[in-house]
């Protein structure tokens, strides 16, 4: 691939603000004040700082009314990654001109539900590529394109353009990995990362793996749901009318007449940040006459889902980095693309196929520790991967 696309010409050329082979070595580091810093490694000099557009709105929260103190916003809390990729970095100029560029991709970590990307081919002159932000409270996804134009995509109605469906994106603790995969037989540069942290309280986001298109300004290719795969007993799906004012729903009307509280619990999806409760009449371990009540009427025309799941007090999410196996990392990988391994707070290990062998995006649960708050089997870290001499892969 690199030979076919003249990678050596790029490495030996002068598109990096000078000869690329002699390009400055830069240390990129995010800070809780909301700034990504670029330091020259040879002398520690700071070359520049960058505030991503999805962080700007939080800066006003830093000043504190208390003397000699500030409020922490966590800002640019995630670790950035840098890689050379071959793509058209000027997609809005009416022509297609792919070339090798060095891109930096960063996640906000505890600073928010978002990512940002820069072109750092010339380390003295970085340029903005795109940024993404998910606001779960306002139920909106924000996207800044390569020209800095901001577009918003609300989903209170339950619908959103699939290219911007970041509804399940939590705090982006999971460091993105930049890889090249085959999509419809063509090479494509993508980033893959976990859905992040949800505070262990919000089931609406965090339990997914995202694959985004780096050649198309961060638009989505695929969201793979990892949520409660082993625990869901049944889903009850219904919707609100277009001019909805209803705050109470009789769940028997949608097929949920009762459940056993000794083994099961109910989870509600689709209402965003609207507070709710489920009430009923208890007879022993059985709850009957179930009512779903919201503090305010949900928006009209949305889809709601009540899931009956095996009893667990864990709200699942994927805060850990992913383990990604590519041919760049081992000669045992006889495929294009990557094999990805994700861990989650439910204690599961999931394999995701992003190779050209088998079915693209196929998932397999390899391990389930059945974690609870009592046994504490949460997994916050990525699995360590090794390949032994007879080509067997081991996860630790």
Where are these regions (language model features)?
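Solvent-exposed, conformationally flexible loop/turn segments
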Residues: 244-246
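Extracellular/luminal ectodomains and secreted, surface-exposed scaffolds of diverse proteins
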Residues: 263-297
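A fold-level detector for beta-propeller and closely related beta-sheet-rich head/sensor domains
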Residues: 1-239, 251-254, 258, 262, ...
């Amino acid at each position: 691939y690199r030979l076919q696309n003249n990678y050596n010409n790029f490495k030996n050329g002068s598109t990096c603000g000078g000869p690329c082979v002699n390009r400055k070595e830069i240390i990129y580091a995010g800070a809780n004040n909301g700034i990504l810093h670029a330091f020259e490694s040879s002398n520690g000099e700071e070359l520049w700082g960058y505030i991503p557009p999805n962080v700007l709105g939080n800066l006003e929260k830093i000043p504190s009314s208390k003397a000699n103190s500030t409020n922490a916003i966590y800002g640019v809390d995630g670790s950035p990654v840098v890689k050379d990729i071959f793509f058209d970095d000027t997609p809005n100029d009416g022509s297609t001109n792919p070339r090798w560029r060095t891109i930096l991709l960063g996640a906000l970590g505890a600073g928010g539900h978002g990512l940002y990307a820069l072109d750092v081919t010339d380390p003295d002159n970085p340029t903005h590529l795109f940024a993404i932000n998910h606001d779960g409270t306002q139920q909106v996804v924000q996207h800044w394109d390569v020209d800095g134009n901001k577009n918003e995509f609300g989903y209170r109605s339950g619908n959103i353009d699939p290219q911007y469906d970041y509804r399940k994106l939590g705090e982006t603790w999971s460091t993105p990995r930049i890889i090249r995969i085959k999509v419809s037989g063509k090479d494509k540069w993508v980033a893959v990362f976990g859905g992040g942290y949800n505070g262990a309280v919000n089931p609406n986001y965090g339990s997914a793996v995202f694959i985004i298109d780096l050649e198309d300004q961060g638009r989505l290719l695929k969201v793979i749901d990892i949520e409660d795969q082993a625990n869901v007993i049944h889903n009850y799906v219904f919707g609100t009318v277009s001019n909805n004012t209803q705050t109470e729903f009789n769940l028997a009307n949608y097929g949920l007449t009762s459940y056993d509280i000794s083994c099961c619990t109910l989870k509600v999806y689709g209402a965003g940040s609207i507070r709710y409760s489920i009430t009923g009449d208890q007879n022993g371990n059985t709850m009957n006459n179930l009512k779903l009540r919201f503090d305010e009427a949900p928006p009209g025309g949305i889809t709601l889902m009540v899931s009956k799941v095996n009893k667990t007090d864990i709200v699942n999410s994927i805060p850990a980095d992913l383990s990604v196996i590519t041919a760049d990392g081992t000669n045992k990988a006889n495929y294009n693309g990557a094999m990805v391994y994700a861990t989650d707070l439910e204690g599961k290990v999931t394999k995701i196929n992003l190779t050209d062998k088998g079915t693209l995006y196929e998932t397999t649960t390899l391990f389930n520790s059945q974690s609870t708050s009592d046994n504490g089997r949460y997994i916050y870290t990525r699995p360590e991967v090794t390949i032994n001499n007879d080509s067997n892969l081991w996860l630790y």
